[in-house]
Amino acid sequence: MVKHILFFCVFVWVSTFAFGKESKLYGPDGKLCVIVSDEGGMPSYSVLYEGVTFLQKSPLGIETNLGDFTQQMALTNVGQLSSVNEEYQLLTIKNSNPQYQANVQTYTFSKEGKKIYDIVFQVSNHDIAFKYRIYPQGNTLCCIVKKEATGFVLPKGSTTFLCPQAAPMGGFARTSPSYETSYTVDDVIGKNGWGNGYTFPCLFKNEDKGWVLISETGVSSAYCGSRLLGKENGLYTIGFPQEGEYNGNGTVSPGMALPGETPWRTVTVGRTLAPIVETTVMFDVVKPLYEASQEFQYGCGTWSWIIGGDNSMNYDEQKRYIDFSADMGYSSVLVDALWDSRVGRDKIAELADYAASKGVALYLLSLIHISEPTRPLYISY
């Protein structure tokens, strides 16, 4: 009898992992759908728009120094459905008065009867944002996140528009990865850039069905910024910084106090590029960390280097750009690299006085953060 009971318990445990549970969350207009599952003990999600698959079943989960929470997991609770309806002002983007409407649901994943983390999903008409909320384990009130299983599986036939990330400590003054590499256009899936993944945001085309934009938002000092790593079979996963960045100082594995939260991972879906271009999800799901001490006024400016490069760094050309800014009604000029040697400190002060007479301010490039000991550190006008 004991053997029969034991067999039954094992069968139920295996069956639960094999078949799993799933839950669907729709955007307000009912077109965008996220399906969250724990089939096979593996947390996952998929994304459909108007019934068409834009992300196939994609992995979720994290691995920490407290354990591997990417497998043998169970979806033990689906929170009550709620909604967000917010309007805010942001004067530095094309849509200065975004209105954000989304449906919200929290999915609790457990292991061996213990709650490990919630995954909070917010789904609007074209945007998905999700993050992990990690629970303390007994008296352990902190952890190190070794890696995220968080992934995005693109359908077969998808193509990519991605910016490969450079290896660390190379390029100009050893500043790479400086996120200035060229995008590849309409390339096949299954690559990993130059071997180091890709820089957000990452754009994909789902054949003739539409577009997918993958990115992140809400990154603070409590976690690290991430990149996207290309794998096989259309899978792309979250990757932490490269070991050699910042001369190898520090760790690439974020540590966090518990309970703690990760940044938001975002997915924007559209039949056309319009929802991709118009999305404000990177602002919609975050709140200001603090109130500004004053109301800052933003303005337009000019920059010679983007057109003329290093050769444009001379007194006469910078004066011409000051005149150009004044004629256009712009408020500033960015004076880029080499101004200290090609214009000089005395002449740059003269330029600053001339600019002030025209109602134009100068921003002078400072290279304190990179390997340029001959460059000035603190000079501004």
Where are these regions (language model features)?
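N-terminal accessory beta-strand-rich subdomains and adjacent acidic, glycine-rich linkers
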Residues: 22-278, 282
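Acidic-and-aromatic substrate-binding clefts and catalytic sites of carbohydrate-active enzymes
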Residues: 310-313, 337-346, 371
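An acidic-aromatic substrate-binding cleft motif
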Residues: 257-324, 328, 332
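Bacterial Sec-dependent N-terminal signal peptides
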Residues: 1-22
